[in-house]
Amino acid sequence: MIMKFFDREREINEILGILDETPDNIYFIYGPINSGKTTLMMEIINRLKDDKKYRIFYYNLRGVRISSYSDFFDIMFEIREDNKFKQMVKDADVLVEGIKFIEKTAKLFNESIILPSDLAKVILSKQKGFDVFRYLERVFREMNKKGLKPVIIIDELQRLKGLKSNGELIDDLFNFFVRLTKELHITHCFCLSSDSLFIEYVYDRAELRGRADYILVDDFDKETALKFMDFLSEDILGRKLSEDEKELIYSYVGGKPKDVYDVIIKLKLGKELKDILEFMLKEEIQKLKYFLEDVKEDDEELYNKIVDALKIFKENYEIEDIKIPKNIREFLVKKNILFLNPIEGTLKPQSFLVWNAIKKLLNGH
């Protein structure tokens, strides 16, 4: 069963408002793991399905290893044999005709840009001096002239981490985005990630001050989480949960949409609520225990510093980031134990389950 969309009207209205205006910023959509960033963008795309002026290019990098330009372009483009295009370009400029082809074949929603093989041979060749991004700029310019509004969405941006050792593609990609948004105002660009450290790396490396903005998609607050439980239980279980049941669920998993959904699905399978929640917590405790065990085996001094840092969360769910030394907090963020909000300057566990695991595991410390 696929989880139905719920709420997020504030974020939806903000993004729809951005799309309605002239492009002027790159937008980083960030938040904890499984807070609903992708679901939100899919809902926005769904709401735009009848608006023929948009051309959305959505690239989900999940599960993809990217370590070179070639890897990235393999995701961005789909190469096809096209005999009609082959005949068309016999006596014409392949690049000019290519722009017309891309514009004509682009739909409202695209997970790749279709390239005829004859065009791909030219723009993806190793010829010195050819700039694929400049060519795409020409494509988007032509779309814009015809009243179309291109939108680029990069989901799971952190998958570009493999390029940190060869940062030229990150530079070129975000210079391209700056060109499309801040300079030419022809294309909206959104980048989604739960890795706020990598977002900050990109922000600094690509010199995006004054050229980028942030939209937080956080876990639900308590009031919204309880309403979400009502929504799911009525839809999936055909009944309402009691107030005590909802409070119990929230005490274990908080407002993380995926965790709440998993609880309701397991209830549908006939499992007892307390058993479901205890199992989820035990699983999280074991993950944290083994993580700490690995750290201790490698570096006991680091282990002690991490335990000291995590103990701060025994009494607080969210703290100021500088309460934990920079190298320790960044280590815990990279390991997905903590989530850093770089705008608010705060740290919190990636989920209520992680928070509860920290409190249980460190109870004797």
From Swiss-Prot:
Keywords: ATP-binding, Nucleotide-binding
InterPro entries hit by this protein: AAA+_ATPase, ATPase_dom, MJ1010-like_2nd, P-loop_NTPase, WH-like_DNA-bd_sf
GO molecular function annotation: ATP binding; ATP hydrolysis activity
Transmembrane intervals: none
Residues that coordinate or bind ATP: G31, P32, I33, N34, S35, G36, K37, T38
Alphabetized CDD domains for the sequence: AAA
UniProt keyword Nucleotide-binding present: yes
UniProt similarity note: Belongs to the archaeal ATPase family.
Name recorded for this polypeptide: Uncharacterized ATP-binding protein MJ0075
